[in-house]
Amino acid sequence: MAFDYKKEYKEFYMPKNKPGIIEIPKMNYIAVRGKGNPNEENGEYKSSIGLLYGIAFTIKMSYKGTHKIEGFFEYVVPPLEGLWWQENTQGLDYARKEDMHFISMIRLPDFVTKEDFEWAVQEATKKKMQDFSKVEFFPYDEGLCVQCMHIGSYDDEPATVDLMHDYMKANGYELDITDTRYHHEIYLSDPRKCDVSRLKTVVRHPIRKTE
């Protein structure tokens, strides 16, 4: 049975649809940076997803080839995630999607080293005849956060964010979005296959204790 991060780490990937406080450990990701409206058909965001999955599946299927990764075990590729921000804006203004910056990412198993990642980029470039140079090995130490499961349209997320911020303040915390800590989304549903009213997205914000 392949290891499924969503099931083994439910506290990170399957929170309740009410806010909670959680400490997120440092994790390694494959990531692509970009900007622009995520709904744009030929935009940077949609392009980033193809690049990420090209590398993710090269690593996942590596055991069938000659490159052996030490400690490898079979696993389900973790869900797509995104860090989002807009310059000079605390949080996100959903009406200004064209101003959004993002780091699109997929979690790597702990056994994948930077050298394994670099091998995967070379392998995918060679096999798929595609440029994967935008993909990077991205360690992210997220730390203390408030998070909540959002069900429904991405455009309705502000209501969930308001609940999170009310809960955060009631428990003695304040928002800590900075140049290195971001609005974070984890996409548990495929919008191409799921009705918009049933989309599941983990929304996560960095916080700190109120002084």
Regions found by a protein language model. Name each.
Residues 1-211:
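A solvent-exposed interaction/effector surface
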